[in-house]
């Protein structure tokens, strides 16, 4: 390898990685220590593992950090890594040990499963209009999000900033005349991985840190680029201890949104199968959980507790996002990883995976009112490029959807990639269907005539009393990679609301 320039710098933070290599935990430790640093500050990594000499320079290049120097003494390497580049180094003195705010450790493994009575809520009216969940974040919100996840912005400051962003999101939805409101997921870095910053014994790390763990790092990096996924900005949860829900995942989102409007509020959560696929990674989670099923058991308990608390606090609807179900049926069993819908772990046959997903979802929603739960399924929302997303109708998923004990299906149906809605005609009569009638990925606002025609078709198929009107997916599933501007998102929701008004009058 190219020898770094050997200069003497005093590190701002130092840690000993022992004999860990880059594929078995060292990168997690580096990330924990380097994130809170300011750009230009220096981290010392001590290691006795020989392979680190070769692998660390590659990691530095991928992540945009500078390897300042390396030296070896009595079998122990010392690597000085500058966050960013030395040219950014400040002359002002730095704290000797920044606070590591990106991760929380606990030893307890028990997760309570408190069951509380759901608050009484009026049933959601037929033809109600609602978004799926996410809303484009303002630039200042994105900046606050990055600083917070890196430990450079405190919780209080972050929440105050997020409150302002939520106000803007809710105001836009109210101007659009939606019937059901969300907070726009303004506090989340993306629709699923955000839980990694809230659960104990879990850590959010950039996708670039995971490249050493995949079979073909170069091919995986090419896939991320082709999907418009910014690997250095999108963070992924890494599990390094027994998961524990020491604080709510979304109760604060619900409470604040309820303070802004009298309209019913929906909360979206990542589904248990999605979270299992995201969090189960060989060389990381298997050091804590013997099997994927064991990890899934803790995820189910966490989501059950969250669901009960949200319903007790008055959430009109709790939606579980499971877009990765389409990846199961439309890509088949693969021995390689894919970023489809944000899930990186490998999977088995479609039959096995769908059965596993059904079991997990039904465990989460057991013993709660059917009409207060929903499942959202789409074919990926990480890029505007329709050709890069999955295609196929719902027919392979209908048996699974029918077997889920949820009362509402919120589905992608506007894009031609989703096929014809007739594939869903056999869904249970006591369930309601949210019809995707606008595509968040397109630059045009669908015409009123187009929306009404498709909604009437859905009413003929399912019954007008069984349908809702919604977009295909969120407008900004990944915070740093929105598929729609806030102005366009508001226009699309407004079109849905106008269509609903006309349909109700007929």
Listing of model-derived features with the role each one plays in the protein:
Residues 2-99, 456:
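Domain-level signature for proteins that mediate thiol-based redox and metal-cofactor handling
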Residues 93-506:
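Domain-level signal for soluble alpha/beta catalytic cores
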